[in-house]
Amino acid sequence: MPQISRYSDEQVEQLLAELLNVLEKHKAPTDLSLMVLGNMVTNLINTSIAPAQRQAIANSFARALQSSINEDKAH
């Protein structure tokens, strides 16, 4: 069952494209990109989520990330 979001596909795609452009502009390798994006997620959780909810949000985010990973062997 598809997820229903309060954000339009256009909003999500535009923000994603802008973030990817920044990483490409800085020629960030995959490991640096993942480190920076992970730090951004941590910062958002720590500064925007109530302390009592942070662990649950982090767990939910981790599950969503794991479920979205493609198991295709192609690299």
Curated annotation (Swiss-Prot):
Alphabetical list of HAMAP family matching this protein: UPF0352
InterPro entries in alphabetical order: UPF0352, YejL_sf
Organism annotation: Escherichia coli (strain K12)
Protein name: UPF0352 protein YejL
Gene field: yejL
GO terms under cellular component: cytosol
Family of this protein: Belongs to the UPF0352 family.
Native organism taxonomy: Bacteria, Pseudomonadati, Pseudomonadota, Gammaproteobacteria, Enterobacterales
